Amino acid sequence: MKKIGFIGAFDKIDLIIYAARILTELRKRVLVVDTTILQKAKYIVPAINPTKFYVTDYEGIDVAVGFENLELIDRYLGDLESSYDIILLDIDSSEMFDRFNMQNADKLYFVTAFDNFSLRKGIEIIGDIRERLNMTKILFEREIIKENDEYLNLLTLTYPIDWNREKFYFPYDQGDLTAIIENQRVTKIKLKNLSEQFRDSLLMLVQEISPEIRTGDIKRVFKEL
């Protein structure tokens, strides 16, 4: 079972759910865990009887909300380890990073835009992490600006973070935001209305999470969704 962490203050639950949707279509058993303070998944993922903590199905994805560690999810489900191939965790605090033992994750992504809150709050989260870690950047920008990446490197220069060479750029524009909001409104995951750059980056992200999946199979799913 792979454990993948998406770290940062930026709103990333939709991105995580989109990646999970593609993976489930490719016969991967995926659990999305929203550990964030706002628990946005509670409001965008339909649930029949939402309680303080629960797991619900959303288009083949299991989504967990309200849990404080993986042990509680395991107790809730009965057997977490054998139930899923991949767990994708949305984390926006160093406390939850520790509670979910993300230092042992198979992959860690730092997700941010370059507004002051997303950037500085996100850096504050990873600044509180004590272990030295490898992380991959997922950057949301209206256009790719080299200086933004260099600025992020400068701000984290003294932090115990080794940035991987590869990085993912997602467009931060009105068209994709409109498509995401429409998906939330109809509670349906549709990828066709997203921009080509967004879909290309999403494809590469899914491929990195599960490199055994063929690119052609991922492209087929994009056409179907």
Regions flagged by a language model, labelled:
Residues 12-20, 122, 202:
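Short, highly selective alpha-helical patches that border small-molecule cofactor pockets
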Residues 146-200, 204:
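Beta-strand-loop-alpha "switch" segments that mediate conformational coupling across diverse proteins
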Residues 189, 193, 208-215:
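Regulatory and interdomain segments flanking nucleotide-handling catalytic cores
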Residues 19-28:
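A short, Lys/Arg-enriched amphipathic alpha-helix followed by its capping loop at the start of a domain
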Residues 47-66, 75, 125-134, 157-166, ...:
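Inter-domain helical "communication" segments and dimerization helices
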Residues 212-225:
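P-loop NTP-binding site
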